[in-house]
């Protein structure tokens, strides 16, 4: 029985071996099933042994100690090297190949992974990573586009703000370089804001790559910065309304810095010497008291300048100490005070007209004070400044209503004295300007026109005191004007002075018969008349022009303008219906007058040869306008003489 059992066992083993062989052969020719691996593998028991490296095979042992086949796990990182942030992610193939440690059961069997399945899985993983990279690229591109749009908006805002600042910029063209540097820093707030915002955004993106560029946050930062910039601009930039007192201090410091410095230096008082006799001590004491009084006046001026700079007081507080200093004995104090007062009145009569008046000026008393200073002081610079202030006062008043009130006997006497040679060129110029402004008053102009009837009237009992005063005053002034025409003419200012006199004579001639009589028959010293003086002046300048080959530009211009004014006056006199016969008769009544008239008209009507020199605007005036005026005058004179040939 035992023998039969052994044979049965042998046959049973052979049958099992043949079945296994047949199954193996069938597995070899069977087509591969679709790739499938369990999602999770059970965790091995404590006796299970796993290789430490993923590239080595894993060994699984059962509790019975039977040897199992080794499972080769492919390395999912051998085919490519993805980015760092992607490589930290767990790959699905790796999860499939490994086990889930949450389970405690042992995987008893695992199907081998074929090379074809591994390649397909790697291709699918590559496609997924490519899609993921495309999405990342789209996100970064969108973020970059948002940044570019923000930059363009910032640039547009900067250009608009720059244009608005350029429109508001005012001339305050005496600012120091420190203020200009501060303004320049403030003019570019958007650039600094843009760079700060970009740095903040870069730091935020470095901390969190998933955080995108926030447009709303940037706009809020720009708005906050623009508010701060607007506040700074309100401090630095000129506003629509400014207190004229603040502008006044800046103008005084710019135009009168030297004058104020000299004035403030008089605040120091030296003590009198102690070892002196009584007479010297008394004289020194009187002198010291005078200096102390002047120093006190200067200190009041200093206090007024300080207070008005802070807006505590009005302009009257500044004018009063200046007027007190104008009455001082020291010539330097008077001159410097007049210069500061000159700038102050220019500010009041100019800029302050746009604002509320801060000083109720008594122009008549101020005009009277300046007239006294101009007539009594001997210094030419003091006289000039006083006359300049008088001209400012007259120009600030209305010619039809208020200008007549400034005319007085004292004013006309001062003008006649200031027109003398001893006064100097600049004093004469200011006096002529003052007389021209007063003569432009319609009422005074009518008074000058009525002198012709009053002078021809033999009944002196009917002459009023005012007309007699006007006749005498005008006579002295016109004698001073005639003296200006005979003075030497060496500079352009001398020629300009003569031109101003010709303009006054032209204004007087347009008044009527009195003006024509003034020019033709008014007897001047040395038995001359204004017509003779004018012709002598014109011929003398023609001779000077012909002898100077390369005259200075300013002298040539002043001479050309003088010739033009003389020819305009002569043409007006010889063309008037009521004056032409009288003037032409006076021009040709004597041999000397006729010779001067014909010589001047003939020489000026000829065309000058420039000899290839470039023709300037003054040259064009000399060769066209003056030549035409001379030809018209020549035609009138020759027609009166009976010669119609030109």
From Swiss-Prot:
Motif window: Nuclear localization signal: 119-126
Region described as Disordered: spans on this chain: 42-70
PTM comment text: Probably phosphorylated by ATR.
Classification via SUPFAM superfamilies: ARM repeat
Description of what induces expression: Becomes more restricted to the distal region of the root tip upon addition of aluminum (Al).
Domain spans labelled Phosphatase tensin-type: 376-646
Molecular-function GO terms, alphabetical: phosphoprotein phosphatase activity; protein dimerization activity
PANTHER family recorded: ATR INTERACTING PROTEIN, PROTEIN SENSITIVE TO UV 2
UniProt main location, coarse: nucleus
Disruption phenotype: Hypersensitivity to DNA-damaging agents including UVB, gamma-radiation, aphidicolin, ionizing radiation and hydroxyurea (HU). Defective in cell-cycle G2/M arrest in response to DNA damage. Reversed extreme hypersensitivity to aluminum (Al) of the mutant als3-1, including Al-dependent terminal differentiation of the root tip and transition to endoreduplication. Increased tolerance to Al.
Subunit structure, as described in the record: Forms multimers through the coiled-coil domain.
Tissue distribution: Accumulates throughout the root tip.
Protein's recorded name: Protein SENSITIVE TO UV 2
Compositionally biased tracts (Polar residues): 48-70
Family from the record: Belongs to the serpin family.
GO terms of biological process kind: DNA damage response; positive regulation of cell cycle G2/M phase transition; regulation of cell cycle; response to aluminum ion; response to cisplatin; response to gamma radiation; response to hydroxyurea; response to ionizing radiation
Coiled-coil blocks: 123-157
Location of the protein in the cell: Nucleus; Cytoplasm
Cellular component terms per the entry's GO annotation: cytoplasm; nucleus
Function field: Required for tolerance to DNA-damaging and cross-linking agents such as UVB irradiation, gamma-radiation, aphidicolin, ionizing radiation and hydroxyurea (HU), cisplatin (CDDP) and mitomycin C (MMC). Involved in cell-cycle G2/M arrest in response to DNA damage. Required for aluminum-dependent gene regulation and root growth inhibition in an ATR-dependent manner by halting cell cycle progression and triggering loss of the quiescent center (QC).
Keyword vocabulary terms for this entry: Coiled coil, Cytoplasm, DNA damage, Hydrolase, Nucleus, Phosphoprotein, Protein phosphatase
Site feature location: Reactive bond: 579-580
